[in-house]
């Protein structure tokens, strides 16, 4: 009888155990896309859930076109902060839109506002007992005429690295890893990682498409796998639970 009670208690506690939420915040390179069965564009965080066991729930809160500034000013961060609980994770990848210097609603100086917005995400995540993880922006497909992949993000990745170092934040250098990915595919084949279509090649588009920033399903899946592999390499006790939940 005693053994039966123990078994019932174990089953009950397992069924009602609180799951860990992995929040992903950032821009269109991460964000969920409408009509995913037809739409060839995918964000890498959109395809992240299948890499984890069911005890990790990915809440992809990345939104097209957002910078750290607009994400905060639109109260998107506030809504996440209110829900954060001890043991959760927040993956933070911004930069693409922070560099939009012609747009006052989005632009941030990498050495001031961008840096302090990242620090805010980190400190407020920790206030809730959750773990922040900083990621640099994914590389754009930007090969020159000699086949050299030219960086496009200015000092934003540098500031992300510096904040991670100074505040001892688990860190994934996604810019570096995706540069390696782009280079491994080369100037022509790397189009497969992005959105390159002629009229009639894809029913979702009614005209030519040549987008070297956003991702195809292949590109998104490759980068999600890169993120998973990078998580495994992080030497920080705070991510052990996440590591153990990888399939």
Where do the language-model regions lie?
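Bacterial Sec-dependent N-terminal signal peptides
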Residues: 1-19
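Serine-esterase "nucleophile elbow" of acetyl-processing enzymes
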Residues: 15-62, 78-88
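Glycine-centered flexibility sites
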Residues: 26, 43, 62-65, 95, ...
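Flexible, active-site-adjacent loop/turn segments at secondary-structure boundaries
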Residues: 28, 42, 69, 154, ...
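Short, flexible micro-motifs
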Residues: 29, 46, 65-68, 90, ...
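Acidic/histidine-rich helix-loop elements
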Residues: 31-41, 62-71, 100-110
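Alpha-helical cap/lid subdomain in secreted, periplasmic
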Residues: 75-221, 225-246
């Amino acid at each position: 009888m005693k053994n039966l009670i123990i078994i019932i208690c174990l089953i009950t506690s397992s069924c009602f155990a609180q799951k860990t939420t992995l929040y992903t915040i950032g821009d269109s390179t991460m964000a969920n896309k409408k009509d995913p069965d037809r739409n060839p564009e995918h964000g890498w965080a959109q395809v992240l859930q299948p890499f984890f066991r069911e005890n990790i729930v990915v809440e992809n809160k990345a939104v097209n076109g957002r910078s750290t500034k607009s994400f905060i000013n639109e109260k998107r961060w506030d809504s996440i902060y209110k829900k954060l609980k001890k043991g959760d994770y927040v993956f933070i990848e911004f930069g693409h839109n922070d560099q939009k210097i012609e747009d006052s609603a989005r632009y941030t100086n990498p050495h001031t506002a961008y840096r302090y917005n990242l620090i805010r995400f980190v400190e407020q995540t920790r206030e809730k007992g959750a773990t922040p993880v900083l990621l640099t922006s994914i590389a754009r497909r930007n090969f020159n005429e000699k086949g050299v992949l030219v960086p496009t993000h200015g000092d934003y990745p540098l500031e992300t690295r510096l904040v991670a170092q100074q505040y001892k934040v688990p860190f994934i250098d996604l810019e570096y890893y995706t540069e390696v990915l782009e280079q491994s595919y080369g100037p022509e084949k790397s189009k497969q990682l992005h959105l390159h279509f002629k009229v009639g090649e894809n029913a979702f588009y009614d005209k030519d498409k040549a987008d070297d920033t956003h991702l195809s399903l292949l590109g998104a899946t490759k980068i999600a796998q890169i993120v998973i592999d990078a998580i495994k390499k992080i030497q920080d006790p705070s991510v052990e639970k996440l590591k153990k939940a990888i399939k």
